[in-house]
Design a protein with these regions (language model features):
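Domain-level recognition of nuclease-like catalytic cores that cleave nucleotide substrates
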Residues: 151-204
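Short amphipathic alpha-helical segments and helix-helix/interface helices
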Residues: 50, 136-140, 178-179
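Nuclease-adjacent, charged terminal/linker segments that flank catalytic cores
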Residues: 1-48
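Flexible secondary-structure boundary motifs
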Residues: 82-86, 113, 117-118
Length: 204
């Protein structure tokens, strides 16, 4: 983690002092930095949720045998818990627009399965809007076997979306989409940290 921070600082300083040539637009470099930052924050979000789950008595596992035989547990999407295996073992489709997109966590509470995507955002913008769209898309997904989807958004932008204030047309549109898809898919959830804690408490 510290190595990543140092590399990011070095990269920013390097490009700040150097005029890029026409073959390397500065926007591309910033996009790469933003993507790496988003991935880092996403992983922090995953770890935060796993920590909350563990406090409520859920166990984290790394293989299918333990996951399938335990009532309250969580796993992260990984090589063992890839899309193919998850679809086969849980009987789900996970039909996102982006083909073969994996989510972040699989939560099991007895016979209930919840598939979770976690993001951390503080501001809006091009890359951030794309991540919000991905979270909203998760709410549209449905499964015949009652599996639920969780869109978890942490950070200042989550508070803006969940508030009653205006904040402009874009925010209002995003709120309307969230409400619409939650109404269409009542088994799904859009939560911040407090909402996630409440949901997990109810599952126990």
């Amino acid at each position: 983690m510290e190595k990543f921070k140092n590399n990011k600082k070095i990269t920013k300083r390097y490009f700040a002092k150097r005029t890029l040539n026409e073959m390397t637009p500065e926007e591309w470099v910033q996009a790469i930095l933003d993507t790496n930052s988003s991935r880092k924050k996403g992983k922090c979000g995953e770890n935060k949720l796993v920590h909350i789950l563990k406090k409520q008595g859920f166990k984290e596992f790394f293989n299918w045998d333990d996951f399938l035989k335990t009532d309250y547990c969580v796993v992260k999407f990984s090589k063992k818990f890839n899309l193919k295996n998850v679809r086969e073992n849980l009987g789900v489709k996970i039909k996102t627009k982006k083909q073969n997109k994996t989510l972040d966590l699989i939560i099991k509470a007895k016979d209930k399965i919840l598939l979770c995507e976690a993001k951390h955002l503080n501001t809006s913008g091009g890359g951030q809007d794309k991540q919000i769209s991905e979270l909203i898309e998760i709410l549209r997904l449905t499964e015949k076997n009652g599996v639920s989807y969780i869109s978890f958004l942490d950070g200042k932008y989550s508070n803006i979306l969940l508030s009653d204030n205006g904040y402009g047309d874009k925010i209002i549109t995003q709120r309307k989409e969230i409400n619409k898809f939650l109404n269409n898919s009542p088994n799904n959830y859009w939560v911040n940290t407090a909402g996630f804690e409440s949901l997990i408490f109810d599952l126990k």
